[in-house]
UniProtKB/Swiss-Prot annotation:
The keyword DNA repair applies. InterPro entries: Formyl_transferase-like_C_sf, MPG, MPG_sf. HAMAP family: 3MGH. PANTHER family: DNA-3-METHYLADENINE GLYCOSYLASE. It comes from Deinococcus geothermalis (strain DSM 11300 / CIP 105573 / AG-3a). Its EC number is 3.2.2.-. This is Putative 3-methyladenine DNA glycosylase.
Amino acid sequence: MATPLSPAFFDRDPVKVAREVLGSTLVRVLPGGEVLSGRVVEVEAYDCPRDPACTAGRFHAARTAEMAISPGHWLFWTAHGHPLLQVSCREKGIPASILIRALEPLTGLGSMLTHRPVSRERELTNGPAKLVSALGLKPAEVVGTRVDSPALHLLPPPALLPADAVTVTARIGIKEGRNLPWRFLLRGNPWVSPGVPSMDLAGPLTAKS
């Protein structure tokens, strides 16, 4: 069995982390022992404080302070009243992070549907708030815990995804930093979020290995 990604993995540039987390498996172990899991098919990077998006309303001062903890810990920010799952990056004191935006369900589909009933399965985890709900995550129980904790962790992909398997776009729902290609998704995967990038970046973009 693969070893979960350790906090040390996240102690660096969140853009590089996001690219390498794509294709990993997010594992949630419920209190009763049932395992829910999904393949990470969409990730965004936020490299605060140098990232213009961090000063444009999405991150107020208190929230930014909460993010400035040691790397490799689970965090949440709230958007439109919904908690979104992220992981702290870079050294302690720098509020950089990655945001997990979408999952392709692998195990525990029945429980996910119980947590978040939907008429179309593809709408179960194809968004950052949706996946938090489907996994039954309670921010108060998770925030500040290590990314390799038994209850919630990430298993690395077998290998770094090749460039031709990855699409890179601008991020979704931001007003500043719209020109930064810091959203990574599995090309052609039906579980990616339906959100529209904040800017149509000129020319086709592919991720570099």
